[in-house]
From Swiss-Prot:
Residues 124-502 form the Protein kinase domain. ATP binds at residues 130-138, 153. GO terms for biological process: regulation of ubiquinone biosynthetic process; ubiquinone biosynthetic process. GO terms for cellular component: plasma membrane. Keywords: ATP-binding, Cell inner membrane, Cell membrane, Kinase, Membrane, Nucleotide-binding, Transferase, Transmembrane, Transmembrane helix, Ubiquinone biosynthesis. It comes from Enterobacter sp. (strain 638). It is found in: Cell inner membrane. The active site is at residue 288. This is Probable protein kinase UbiB.
Length: 546
């Protein structure tokens, strides 16, 4: 480790101990050296004994900085790793940090634009940031060419070395988890960290975020439910993104929404519809839909529209995952637990040799109590959570796309019920899911598939006679090759039979000669002739095998 890494590790250890996080070390024989070492560091006592463990963990991560804050946010969605009281505290982590110098941001913008002054491209550039987070911060300006209001997102300077240094330490900690926890290997800590690192590195590439925003805007063009600001891609680079400035009410500001007369029921239902449309219609969903990234337009409060920003994290599901997920939801709400178990096996989410009866019973045991509540109070996110946690006991592999989906669904549900506590997610989502499944099977799906593939077959039609001729010729050649191989195999079997016969004769002659040589030494030449004959016969048999 470098001196810098050692200093950083010391700071992390001191922070963890000052918040009493040594409580997380399990009391096992293998951890005894760690617990002894902890006692030796007596000058680092727990200074927050009045707080619960979950709160102390959250405060420690906030003190350690942006990389650890985002790591905690990601862990809050993995409720199979932590008890609810810790996961709930991690979900409260806020990605808010002090802004860096506006002059430095201006310099970065100029570097991204080819060392040309900001004033060449933009008017009214505000040196004071509009918002600041751990990865980037945002400044306002106007496009010089048309005067449109824009925001410029700039990556923090020198953030990459900080991320790489902290990720090294997180990887070191992850390697210890399987050794320290009895269930550590099943939790796949290295996969969790790799997933987090990929998400973090993706957020550093604003060209990727620009492309995501453009795609999402195209998917919801002229939609009454969601507006995505325009991206000015000519000005975008890996470290800078320029997009239309929007004005709206933060979705978490319930008072402001009510004061302008917003139809809260419709707004909450549209949030659910937007989510399911992204997942099932588009196979492309905004996976960071926390309240800080969602606004509501000031226009037409009786017919409200969402505004979505910050498309750094997106998810997608393939066709099979979408179908299995939709059928899982419907089977669950129909209490068809056998179907749920079979779908998990058919999808490959659990191994094919899983005992379906045992799996069905486990799902029933965990999920049946949920129906003690009214349907309007049942959480889709927690349904998924319960299903996946049960499936993990049957060796379900971690599915990163489903983890993202679960996190996003929990956000959507939380926002929806904050807007309209009586929101019935199942009533809102069921027609959409049933319509989507109906569209994926039967005659409509067959017709659509034919239409999609018709241009390909029309293009290949002239080649079909030649392909048929080639197929017949190859079939004939293949038959000749098979006949030749069959003859060779038969010949080999005959030779092997002859070889075994000759080996037997040769061995018999050699053994007879040896016995005569021992018992009748007066028969001078006979043993020698027998042994020589046996050797010759044995050699002939050996050559037959060549």
């Amino acid at each position: 480790m470098t001196p810098g890494e050692i200093r950083r590790l010391y700071f992390i250890v001191r922070t963890f101990l000052s918040y009493g996080l040594d409580e997380l070390i399990p009391k096992m024989r293998i951890t005894l050296p760690l617990r002894i070492w902890r006692r030796m560091l007596f000058w680092m006592p727990n200074r927050h004994k009045d707080k619960l463990l979950g709160e102390r963990l959250r405060l420690a991560l906030q003190e350690l900085g942006p990389v650890w804050i985002k790591f905690g946010q990601m862990l809050s969605t993995r409720r199979d790793l932590f008890p609810p009281q810790i996961a709930d505290q991690l979900a409260l982590l806020q990605d808010r940090v002090a802004p860096f110098d506006g002059a430095r941001a201006k310099q970065q913008i100029e570097e991204a634009m080819g060392n040309i002054p900001v004033e060449t491209w933009f008017d009214d550039f505000d040196i004071k940031p509009l918002a600041s987070a751990s990865i980037a911060q945002v400044h306002t300006a106007r496009l010089k060419e048309n005067g449109k209001e824009i925001v410029i997102k700039v990556i923090r300077p020198d953030i990459l070395p900080v991320i790489r240094a902290d990720m090294k330490l997180i990887y070191r900690l992850a390697r210890w988890v399987p050794r320290l926890l009895p269930d550590g290997r099943r939790l796949r800590p290295m996969e969790v960290v790799r997933e987090y690192e990929k998400t973090l590195i993706d957020e550093l590439n604003l060209l990727r975020e620009s492309a995501n925003a453009i795609q999402l805007r195209r998917n919801f063009e002229n939609s009454p439910m969601l507006y995505v600001p325009e991206v000015y891609s000519d000005y975008c680079s890996q470290n800078m993104m320029v997009m239309e400035r929007i004005y709206g009410i933060p979705v978490s500001d319930i008072v402001a929404l009510e004061n302008q007369g917003t139809n809260m029921k419709l707004l909450a239902e549209r949030g659910v519809q937007v989510f399911f449309t992204q997942v099932f219609r588009d196979s492309f969903f905004h996976a960071d839909m926390h309240p800080g990234n969602i606004f509501v337009s000031y226009e037409h409060p009786e017919d409200p529209k969402y505004i979505g920003i910050d498309c750094g994290i997106v998810g997608s599901l393939n066709k099979e995952d979408k179908r299995y997920l939709a059928e899982n939801f419907i089977a669950f709400f129909n209490r068809d637990y056998r179907k749920v178990a079979e779908l998990h096996v058919d999808s490959g989410w659990v191994p094919p040799d899983t005992n379906v009866e045992e799996f069905e019973f486990a799902i029933r045991t965990v999920c049946e109590p949920i129906f003690e509540k009214p349907l309007s109070e049942i959480s889709f996110g927690h349904v998924l959570l319960n299903l996946f946690n049960t499936a993990r006991r049957f060796n379900m592999e971690v599915q990163p796309q489903l983890v993202l989906l679960q996190k996003t669904l929990l956000y959507v549900e939380g926002v929806g019920r904050q807007l309209y506590p009586q929101l019935d997610l199942w009533k809102t989502a069921k027609p959409f899911l049933e319509s989507w499944i109906k569209d994926q099977v039967g005659l409509p799906a067959l017709v659509r598939s034919f239409k999609e593939k018709a241009p390909f077959w029309i293009e290949k039609m002239p080649e079909i006679p030649e392909l048929i001729y080639d197929s017949l010729r190859h079939s004939k050649n293949l038959q000749h090759s098979m006949d030749k191989i069959t003859r060779e195999l038969q010949s080999n079997r005959v030779r092997q039979g002859q070889s075994r016969y000759l080996f037997g004769i040769g061995a018999t002659l050699l053994l007879s000669g040896t016995l005569l040589l021992i018992n009748r030494p007066d028969w001078q030449m006979m043993p020698a002739w027998l042994m020589a004959g046996g050797l010759v016969v044995w050699l002939i048999g050996w050559r037959k095998t060549r």
